[in-house]
Amino acid sequence: MNFAIIFSGQGLQNLAHVHELRSMAKELQVVDELELYLPKLFYSDLTEADLYPNEFAQPFIFALQWCRWQKLKPEIGDLMSFSGYSLGELSALICATQIGLEQGLYLAQQRASLMSSAAQDASGLIAVQGINLNTLEPLLTETSTSLSIKLSDSSFVVGGADANLQQLVQQLELRGTRFVKRLNVTIASHTVWMDAAVQPYQQVLQQQDFARLCTAMISGSGGHKFFKTTDAVNALIHQMNHAIDWDACLTVIQENQPDMVLEIGPGSALSKMLLERNPNCLVRAVDDFKSWSGLQAWLDKQSRI
């Protein structure tokens, strides 16, 4: 079977993921690296609210994804592509170039720190469903907010300063928009609010010695298929302050016709999006399973069908 692997973004992490990462760290013998870059992970009084601030969330989610991938690799047959949603695009690049956890944690930490510094005012993201882009765009201009992610023709993520986002929410509610929700993300990623982070992060990435991609990457930024590491790195830089077209990425994944699509997590939102588009597609998320043994048994069963 050939697999397309999807790396999720921020917002759906929870304390169960904390316990899982601690356990995997012991199993994979990477506790020292996590204690260095994520000391808070081992605090006994860690709460769910502690998981969402940007400078903890990004390296934490990356570490979870990296460790999950190390465990999954032996179970995966033919690897067709990696894709990453938002932060997940960094994780996809790191796993595709087979970088170690410590270097990956450094890159995730630098990304988070630079993005937090760029966001001078309190800001974040909201999810909007049930409106088309032609109707939404004038409201974005009116409220000084920006498109962050296109999920479909009627589903978007919007970024901006907190006060401006509140104005937008009010405008959307007045128009009877079906769904508006504040996300558990504390920066306006993939918008002009991140402009100041781009050049310094480009310098950070250019100082790294990336290996060749072990598989193709379908960019979460717009569905472009990359076979060269430099192209994937450039896409990662570009998406910091430009809107992501995740809709296009899912289209290209479908067109490639993988036998199975597996979402690394955290969460299962991306696999559900793909399943809604194509109910006949074999799509699951790691978080769909209560245990690793359950996931392994399911993968083994699929390989024998």
Regions found by a protein language model. Give the residues of each.
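Gly/Ser/Thr-rich beta-alpha loop segments that engage phosphate groups in nucleotides
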Residues: 10-13, 86, 90, 162, ...
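Patatin-like phospholipase
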Residues: 30-41, 63-131, 136
